[in-house]
């Protein structure tokens, strides 16, 4: 199994599945997701495009030596039996309206096997529990099911990927404390302009030996230095739901960081 590298690219990029930036052509996104040029870790989630992101990444991986890249997957939103709940997306598989705890392991195995089939692969290097609800954080049955997937060889390691930035800290810390002997990784929102609440969980992760992947490291594109208050975000772009004025405020903070970073304003 290949551990995640220090840099990664995910199938949510390219504006096709999560409306982050301008939607690019599938062929261009496939080329971007093709491992190589120093980025050999690729991530996907089965809920993106209801499996379409898996399929696109699968095309990008055709012919690539399996030992030459790290593959990270994520499952948790049930688009097989659940109905989309507007902007909240599909319900978690732990929704009591969908199944009982004794069915969690079966769902997880089914979801992972179907995701791997779409990807054209036989295993993940890391499998994440995607945007868990309270049950996902606290249920023994959930983490027994996740550990069983590792035991079965469908993934080399397992972890958790909390959802929106607000409100996950205490749930995540408790999850580490209860199931840290089983959890290998956590993927959290963390960057210099958005330290809260991600950094509040770092000590708990360290105590349990849980390794951390950070996401949204560019603060919605601010650190690329090409997002300005005049930037027109595409319709439905999820960055448009951030608080009003976040771009101007982020740019002002970025300017204060320039002397330390040794870079000049690009605009």
Named regions from a protein language model:
Residues 9, 42, 57, 71, ...:
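Conserved, mostly hydrophobic/aromatic
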Residues 22-36, 101-119, 165-176:
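Short, acidic/polar
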């Amino acid at each position: 199994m290949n551990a995640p590298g220090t840099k990664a690219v995910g199938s949510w990029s390219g504006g096709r599945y999560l409306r982050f930036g301008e939607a690019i052509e599938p062929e261009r996104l496939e080329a971007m997701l093709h491992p190589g040029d120093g980025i050999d870790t690729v991530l996907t989630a089965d809920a993106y495009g209801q499996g379409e992101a898996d399929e696109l990444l699968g095309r990008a991986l055709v012919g690539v030596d399996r030992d030459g890249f790290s593959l990270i997957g994520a499952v948790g939103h049930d688009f097989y039996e659940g109905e989309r709940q507007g902007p909240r997306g599909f319900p978690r598989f732990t929704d009591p309206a969908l199944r009982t705890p004794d069915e969690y392991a079966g769902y997880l195995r089914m979801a992972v096997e179907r995701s791997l089939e779409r990807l054209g692969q036989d295993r993940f290097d890391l499998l994440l529990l995607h945007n868990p609800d309270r049950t996902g954080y606290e249920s023994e049955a959930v983490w027994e099911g996740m550990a069983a997937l590792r035991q079965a060889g469908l993934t080399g390691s397992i972890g958790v990927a909390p959802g929106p930035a607000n409100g996950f800290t205490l749930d995540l810390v408790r999850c580490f404390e209860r199931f840290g002997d089983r959890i290998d990784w956590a993927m959290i929102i963390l960057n210099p302009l958005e330290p809260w609440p991600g950094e509040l969980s770092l000590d708990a992760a360290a105590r349990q030996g849980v390794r951390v992947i950070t996401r949204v490291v560019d603060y919605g594109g601010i650190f690329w230095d090409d997002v300005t208050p005049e930037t027109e975000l595409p319709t439905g772009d999820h960055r448009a739901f951030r608080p009003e004025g976040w771009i101007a405020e982020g740019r002002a903070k970025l300017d204060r960081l320039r002397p330390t970073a040794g870079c000049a304003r690009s605009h």
